[in-house]
């Protein structure tokens, strides 16, 4: 039962993304939310990594399952915005593909803009870079939480063994 709860946890970044985009339109609150959301999402994703580490799922599978939606979102984005033309693009799939990493925009935009020739210009290149960087950031954060818990657990086991 506990492992089934993990499925719900990996869908929550979509909710973060939706709320970030929704609240961004509210004066005052939107700017604050937009600024804080990357840190909230990264702390949450670190915690999700910890939860997957505690699960009964084998380590490799836990790392894959925990990050599968993040990677699939990036692939969906690539398909919708790079491979398909504007006339064939699904607005629903196009928006969903960005929700997973959109809360990280205040961080990833700083790197994506570096790829532009003109200052303060955002093109498809910088947006794709933002999505790739966001995905990498989430995978690393998840992995950090996962490893943190494994190390903590192994130290506790060592203390218990030494204490007996």
Positions of predicted regions on the chain:
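Transmembrane alpha-helical insertion/packing segments
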Residues: 1-48
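Juxtamembrane "helix-exit" motif on the non-cytosolic side of transmembrane helices
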Residues: 18-29, 51-54, 77-87
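Membrane-helix interface and helix-disruption motif detector
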Residues: 24-35, 58, 85-90, 122-126
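Canonical alpha-helical transmembrane segments
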Residues: 38-66
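Hydrophobic cores of alpha-helical transmembrane segments in multi-pass inner/ER membrane proteins
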Residues: 40-47, 135-147
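Juxtamembrane non-transmembrane "cap" segments at the membrane-aqueous interface
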Residues: 84-112
């Amino acid at each position: 039962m506990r492992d089934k709860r993990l499925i719900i946890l990996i869908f929550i970044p979509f909710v973060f993304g939706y709320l970030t985009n929704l609240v961004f339109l509210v004066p005052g609150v939107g700017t604050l939310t937009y600024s804080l959301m990357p840190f909230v999402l990264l702390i949450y994703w670190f915690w999700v990594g910890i939860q997957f580490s505690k699960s009964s799922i084998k380590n490799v599978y836990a790392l894959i399952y925990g990050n599968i939606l993040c990677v699939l979102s990036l692939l969906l984005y690539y398909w919708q915005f790079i491979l398909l033309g504007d006339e064939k693009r699904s607005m629903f799939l196009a928006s969903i593909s960005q929700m997973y990493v959109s809360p990280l925009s205040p961080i990833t935009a700083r790197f994506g803009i570096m790829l532009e020739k003109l200052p303060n210009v955002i093109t498809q290149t910088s947006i794709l870079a933002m999505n790739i960087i966001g995905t990498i950031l989430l995978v690393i954060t998840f992995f950090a939480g996962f490893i943190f818990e494994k190390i903590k657990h192994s130290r506790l086991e060592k203390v218990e063994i030494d204490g007996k």
